[in-house]
């Protein structure tokens, strides 16, 4: 299934498969060939996910593994996405739980048109809730190197911080 999202396309190979985003969508520049996993099949199934691009407010996604990083466009800043609770992922050291609030006072731009939230005070010894400076990369990367998943943290910042781990490329 596919949906037109502004100037870009949103497509899903199959239920439980992968979502492939174009290099440019809604006027923003996104990493090409980045893979996002989902277990939501219908654009009307929006209860646990967040809206994606302008014009696709009913299209949601929910990460199912530690490989998943999120992108959000401007209309989605007040949306929340809730990762599956109690998932232990490698190379992360903790599970992710709770939800992220977009548009909150702790939002910071990732530098390519999307916004990311993190919990103030999160980031104790060796953990970061946002990837700025993590492994030497300022944000979710362009090109071959980026720090994978450092972008998930709950509002309360309890047991939901991520340890940044450098990757050599995007997941395909």
Swiss-Prot record:
A GO molecular-function annotation: structural molecule activity
Residue ranges crossing the lipid bilayer per the database entry: none
Gene expressing this chain: KRTAP13-1
Region (5 X 10 AA approximate repeats): 46-101
Protein species of origin: Homo sapiens (Human)
Record protein name field: Keratin-associated protein 13-1
Oligomeric form and interacting partners: Interacts with hair keratins.
Keywords associated with the record: Keratin, Repeat
GO CC, alphabetical: cytosol; keratin filament
